[in-house]
Amino acid sequence: MPKFYCDYCDTYLTHDSPSVRKTHCSGRKHKENVKDYYQKWMEEQAQSLIDKTTAAFQQGKIPPAPFSAPPPAGAMIPPPPSLPGPPRPGMMPAPHMGGPPMMPMMGPPPPGMMPVGPAPGMRPPMGGHMPMMPGPPMMRPPARPMMVPTRPGMTRPDR
C-alpha cells in the first residue's frame, strides 16, 4: 500500500487513506507548517519584486518620483486645493481668514445634486415614509417613528 508524503511537514503518513490524510491535515503542526511555507513564499515574492524594481531603476527604465527631491531654493509649490493655505490670486479667502462670510446657497441645487430627505423645516408626509426618489436605494426607513423637536430640549413622536 503506498504511503502519503506531506511536503509541508516533510514526512510520510502511515498509509494513504482519506481518514489518515484528513486527520493529519487538520492537525496543529501541519497547519503551522503550511502557514510558515506560504509566509516564506510571500517574503520571497516580495524580495524578488524589490530586486526587479531596483534593477530596472538602476538601468534607467523607471524615472525618479516627481517630488522625491526637495524643491530648488526659492521655488514654492502651492498646496493641493484640499489643504488650507494662504489664498491664491483670484481666489476668495476662506471665512476664517477675515474675508466676507459665505452666503448660504440659494435656489435649486445643480442637476444631479438632489438633497436627501425633506427640506429644512418640513416634515415627512403622514405615515412617516418618504416618496420614492429615482436612483439607487439609500437606506430603509427607520423601524419606529422619527422624533421631531418641537422646542429646544423638547421632543414628541411624529404622528
UniProtKB/Swiss-Prot annotation:
Tissue specificity: Widely expressed. In the testis, expressed in somatic and germinal testicular cells but not in elongated spermatids.
Residues where Phosphotyrosine is found: Y8
Gene Ontology cellular-component terms listed: Cajal body; commitment complex; U1 snRNP; U2-type prespliceosome
Zinc fingers classed as Matrin-type: ranges: 4-36
One Pfam family cited in the UniProt record for this chain: zf-U1
Keywords: Acetylation, Metal-binding, Nucleus, Phosphoprotein, Ribonucleoprotein, RNA-binding, Zinc, Zinc-finger
GO MF terms, alphabetically ordered: mRNA binding; pre-mRNA 5'-splice site binding; protein homodimerization activity; single-stranded RNA binding; U1 snRNA binding; zinc ion binding
Compositionally biased residues, Pro residues: 63-92
Classification via InterPro entries: Matrin/U1-C_Znf_C2H2, Matrin/U1-like-C_Znf_C2H2, U1-CZ_Znf_C2H2, U1_snRNP-C, Znf_C2H2_sf
Gene Ontology biological process terms from the UniProt entry: mRNA 5'-splice site recognition; spliceosomal snRNP assembly
Keyword Iron-sulfur on entry: no
Chain intervals for the UniProt region annotation (Disordered): 62-96
Modified residues (N6-acetyllysine): K52
Biological role: Component of the spliceosomal U1 snRNP, which is essential for recognition of the pre-mRNA 5' splice-site and the subsequent assembly of the spliceosome. SNRPC/U1-C is directly involved in initial 5' splice-site recognition for both constitutive and regulated alternative splicing. The interaction with the 5' splice-site seems to precede base-pairing between the pre-mRNA and the U1 snRNA. Stimulates commitment or early (E) complex formation by stabilizing the base pairing of the 5' end of the U1 snRNA and the 5' splice-site region.
Subunit structure: Component of the U1 snRNP. The U1 snRNP is composed of the U1 snRNA and the 7 core Sm proteins SNRPB, SNRPD1, SNRPD2, SNRPD3, SNRPE, SNRPF and SNRPG that assemble in a heptameric protein ring on the Sm site of the small nuclear RNA to form the core snRNP, and at least 3 U1 snRNP-specific proteins SNRNP70/U1-70K, SNRPA/U1-A and SNRPC/U1-C. SNRPC/U1-C interacts with U1 snRNA and the 5' splice-site region of the pre-mRNA. Interacts (via N-terminus) with TIA1 (via C-terminus); thereby promoting spliceosomal U1 snRNP recruitment to 5' splice sites.
Family as reported in the entry's similarity comment: Belongs to the U1 small nuclear ribonucleoprotein C family.
Name under which the protein is recorded: U1 small nuclear ribonucleoprotein C
